[in-house]
């Protein structure tokens, strides 16, 4: 079987290179070169000959297939891209999902020649009740899925969707099949399970069980997925080996290990369950690998882990090479590779050192230790390769992951078993389902409670914001490699101590300049929005918290503050109630302790204002409405908050702030336009400032010449991201340049930090 491994692994590696790293035209000549290289195999003897031949064949196959697939499937799909909407016919391929502006759904474009490419369509609320299999017509503008919000993205391409469609005038239902196609049975089964979960489970855990059982992470309570990420257990809501192995084990247990019927039923059940959960790479990997392990005894072969892993990887990549860019696939196979490589050796070593006890209590205690040590070895093995992958893709690493996995693994296993049983029972017997759900809810609440509590701790996760932290990450793996090389001579305590020491040194080196400065002003990169952190003397004030970046702006602010070693925000100031300035407040209040909230007393009927006030009351925040100018101090800073000076709209009725620390002064104007800026100059005493947080994301109607002449800023930072408004406007940039400002853009630089050391 190892011959299959020598073919599958190079082929998969070539596909990864062709999709993720190499220029588009390079796989074809590389494939031809590798094929020619295989002709050199007769120059070798013995096993080396077939290893060279299989490796060359695998590389050639991978490179050539990647090139051919792009020509046959991706390029024809991209040919539909255009600036103007065109009416097309589509077959709906999934239940529509609600979005902030309507619904989205995957659909197959139908042409006169037959079935065309898959398209992710975004439409308004007027679509009606669409079902998988429906035939619809709509005018859509088709764009490449490789560009989302102006940035490179591989989320859709890794799923075989190369086009995004934006419906212009609604969606018209043309036809509906009389019977549901077999292709859509798993989706209807998933919908039935999700409906059953909502019926039988309490509201506080229904979303968690929907994610745990069906993989639908969008059902999680607000902020729960971020809690799971920071605490290192987000993998539990990605359907994988934990879920699949239970189904297979239960079937085999009922029908016997050597039963062919039991084996094939288990395989069918696993494949169907993977389809129910959306055919994610992690679910398919688990289903196929478990199937190979079940089939091996029936065909008289010993299971070979490297062969099984590489063969399943190739099986997933051949029908869809661009799945190589899927983060889910990379994390899933990385976790299993790490477990295969080190977990068994670790657990054997630890269990050999474990003493035996003869008394009943001693035996029970030993079993608990065995479970804990085996769980820890699996966790560490899974983290071996997934940690650098997570650091690369998410710029964050959970430091609490091993501990939280130990605390929650039993609850996750029990919750999945109990939750699936309750959901299935609820399909026919709702009363029985509710009774079982009441029991299953207990471990789920434990998992959510632990994840939420740990996520609020400083340093529970390390966001790679600094070169020092990235350097530590590289050093940590260097220490690990050196220990593996000399593990017979080096005690494990030495590299463990080195890892802890270097981590502490990296964290202190990163945080010390910020914490020791008289004042640090950080314009956070929240996309098209604003969020500015003022930090002084260990105390922090956040001005605004909104944006349209991929991460919740509340999470971004909380991550940044917790990276400085604190989970307390002394005050939150909101200039006005627009989502690009206040949309992240719910998650911010869920993550941090915020005792004071300063708000403008305007637009009392605004829904966002009402939501913020309700959350403030629920979290025990003291709310101060500012109708007059207010002045207060924190750390070494004096902060003056100017009451609204305009009228007519939220932008004009917002707060503005002047921050003073020694000789350093900064001005924040929110979304103030030039008319209100002139009022600010006229009615308030504005000094010359060092830093201007440019108003309204660099709009041409803000940052007037009068304001720049009045305050003469030396530096200016513009908080903006992908938008359709033209921010920052060329006119604003020209005025700032003419005023002699050094200009910094969060869009290009990420978080922008200014540290004032004092005299």
Residue ranges of predicted features:
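Core dinuclear metal-dependent hydrolase active-site scaffold
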Residues: 217, 317-325, 452-571, 617-691, ...
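Membrane-embedded alpha-helical segments of integral membrane proteins
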Residues: 1-42, 434-485
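Hydrophobic alpha-helical transmembrane segments in multi-pass membrane proteins
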Residues: 6, 14, 54-57, 222-402, ...
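N-terminal leader/targeting segments
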Residues: 1-79, 189, 285
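Aromatic-rich juxtamembrane segments at the membrane interface
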Residues: 158-294, 571, 596, 639, ...
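Metallo-beta-lactamase
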Residues: 569-580, 602-603, 692-696
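Cap/insert and terminal regions of metallo-dependent hydrolase folds
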Residues: 596, 677-751
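Membrane-interface helix/helix-cap signal primarily in integral membrane proteins
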Residues: 60-235, 555-562, 568, 602-604, ...
